[in-house]
Amino acid sequence: MPTNLPLLLPEQPPPTGTAHPNRFVSEMGAVGMPSFESFAPSLHRERWALHAGQPAATCAKKRCVGSNVMARRNFPCDSLILAYFGNALRLAPGGGQGWFNRTGIEPFRAQLYLCSVAQALWLKSAVEASRAKNELGLLLWSLNDQWPTGGWGTLEYGSSTVAGQVLGGRWKPIHYLLRRTLFANVIATCGSAGQLPRFATCYVRNDGAAPFHGSVRISAVELSTGNSTRLLTFDARLPAGPGALRLLPTLPLDHIDGSTHVLLARCNVASTPAGGHRHESLASGSLVSRNEVLLAPPDELLLPAASVHVAVQSRRGDGDAVKLKLTANATALFVHLTTLANGRFSDNFFLLPAGSRTVLFLPFGPLDEKLLRSSVRVDHLQHRLGTASNS
């Protein structure tokens, strides 16, 4: 299956907005596995693998012959992992059965993490491609999983009475992307219009009910050093949406390679929109969306060896939110926090250059700080590709 990375964009976008022919897209999605915390309690330890460490069952017309316990765990993500990580894991197309059958805590955690990353990247490309067209509505399938299994949800199963689950459903990586970037009113992204590796095509789009006046800043982050180079600053003045789209100036990519750099696109408010809705009345300079853009599939990235540590600090003074400090000794990509405590993080699944960053844990209901401290853990792409290939 194609990864659509770099994102393929039209050289000239079609006319957009309600005055032009448009469509509503319903529905699309991609399979993603839940976290180890969610999935593992439903399996015996010797079955902790995407293929359960068992011979494959034969399934057709909703009937399976064989004893493989994963045969009825809904939808597999083999094709996604092979497409996005097959080269890095040295898996042949259509192969890798031994890798999918590796059992144990760390192999299973790596398999589940890589599946969730692939789900997020596939949907990210699909949504960004959709917003480059005059598509004024998009329905993703689906919101939540119906039990701890491989499924289409952006949230895990949400019954807190079942072992490993959190109240309302633990957010998968894709759900954090939807909140931070993909379903933000204003988004900027970049891709190829047949011009890579020398140039990138970028757009900014406003689907909000109010006009947007702000800046779009696009930088290139070097993976080996974490150094950031500003490539473009654009004064964006967009009418009210939906479908207010502007093509940005063509971006030269001199000395920038998709395997060594990622792009960072940030949209900031320049001034508060007069008469704007409450959620649109942001302070001058406020960040409205942040987008980390790959110019190559993830298995082509030259990621440095990185160690990322998380430390639970203290409650924020105005409530039950808890500060967590993440520290990396080198650039880490797709840094993802997981915990057994009921709640979500203020941000998750992001690029972390060498240094530290603070995020908040926002509890669902009463805070269980002891459980948060004892169960929080962190993943990132280079680490999990290593544990997946060396286990």
Language-model segments: which ranges?
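C-terminal accessory/binding modules appended to enzymatic or scaffolding proteins
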Residues: 305-353, 360-363
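Conserved active-site loop/cleft motifs that coordinate metal ions or position small ligands
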Residues: 136-142, 336, 375-379
